UniProtKB/Swiss-Prot annotation:
Resulting phenotype, C12S: Abolishes phosphatase activity
EC number of this enzyme: 3.1.3.16
Enzyme kind, highest EC tier: hydrolase
InterPro entries, A to Z: RNA_pol_II_suA
Cellular component terms per the entry's GO annotation: cytosol; mRNA cleavage and polyadenylation specificity factor complex; nucleoplasm
Role, per record: Protein phosphatase that catalyzes the dephosphorylation of the C-terminal domain of RNA polymerase II. Plays a role in RNA processing and termination. Plays a role in pre-mRNA polyadenylation via its interaction with SYMPK.
Protein name: RNA polymerase II subunit A C-terminal domain phosphatase SSU72
Coiled-coil intervals: 160-186
Taxonomy, superkingdom: Eukaryota
Record GO biological process: co-transcriptional mRNA 3'-end processing, cleavage and polyadenylation pathway; termination of RNA polymerase II transcription
Subcellular location: Nucleus; Cytoplasm
Pfam families, A to Z: Ssu72
Species name: Homo sapiens (Human)
Amino acid sequence: MPSSPLRVAVVCSSNQNRSMEAHNILSKRGFSVRSFGTGTHVKLPGPAPDKPNVYDFKTTYDQMYNDLLRKDKELYTQNGILHMLDRNKRIKPRPERFQNCKDLFDLILTCEERVYDQVVEDLNSREQETCQPVHVVNVDIQDNHEEATLGAFLICELCQCIQHTEDMENEIDELLQEFEEKSGRTFLHTVCFY
């Protein structure tokens, strides 16, 4: 088992649903975890598929909650968005962009391939300073409440297994293969360096 706790980041596009559900579950399990989005803006479903609610990453979850409450309380209660924002504001004040974070992590989990590509591209564009490895793993999770919950438990189980390895560098590939077979999902995995 690693001598220090695993430093984990979970990343989706808007730091709202998938990354926050995983953040919530991982922090309840005692992990050192942060969550992020990679998008240029935060997007939440609106009254129609072509009319999303778009916010800046500086907007707090509380401000988004109050804005949607004012716009259409019934719609955003029924589709679960207000409930999700209520959970989010109990975890942290506002969404965060991965590209603006300079903290170091041991493991970064992304929730879709496009986000994985953005995270890897960002890490590879940074100047290497410490040569400390960071494992980036993609777990494809559909962006809905049910899949976010299932995906969060899978991410949590994966983190618990990695936390208990003797040698993460040499055991992670085999571990991911076991998880692929067990879950029926395919994981992308690469190593970047800080």
